[in-house]
């Protein structure tokens, strides 16, 4: 009778310990979600600071020092004081003169991005990118930009934009916003530098559309990685020392009894 009670209490203790470890396991914080207060992406809610995407008098689909699809020191679809990756108002991509200057002046890559993508398996760390991994290839998302011109432009030029994103493990970020912001920056930068070194330039419209497309892909990548991260964590909890010791003790007691 006494052994039966002891076995019952050990079983309760085992379940309680396993549950407590499961709830206490560290996981990335949601950060309030998209556009729901707190530090948000784009812009991280910091007026006057570096905002992403570039804010030049209007947000997505609004005037940007001149309406989208209208002249802005050069019509959309044409170089804007020099194409992307070339002099642009006194500075090229990453050379100042634009909101992307914080990335620093890029050096010419020694390896074509497509070659890197072909050689690296999805989820593998890409050499030379500081621990970033290359995600799986995705179908480019269906996005409406608020006007017929940009919707049509995206349909006709979507092949020019990335179908894979660069990211770091989810446990290195405090919330989804930070991972997505970093993912967009590195992916757009790598794709732009690689493309411009081949003699192709991106217009303002290209950059606006590409940032939106990559952002959506980074969100999808985050969701996939978070799910996999939680599943790995659940498996690790089951075989962590406290539950295993309690389970062995319970089995020994039942066998002896």
UniProtKB/Swiss-Prot annotation:
Residues with a covalently attached lipid (GPI-anchor amidated alanine): 234
Binding site for Cu(2+) 3: 80-82
A GO CC term assigned to this protein in UniProt: side of membrane
Sequence repeat residue numbers: 54-62, 63-70, 71-78, 79-86, 87-95
Family that this chain belongs to: Belongs to the prion family.
Implicated disorder: Found in high quantity in the brain of humans and animals infected with degenerative neurological diseases such as kuru, Creutzfeldt-Jakob disease (CJD), Gerstmann-Straussler syndrome (GSS), scrapie, bovine spongiform encephalopathy (BSE), transmissible mink encephalopathy (TME), etc.
Protein name: Major prion protein
Gene assigned in the entry: PRNP
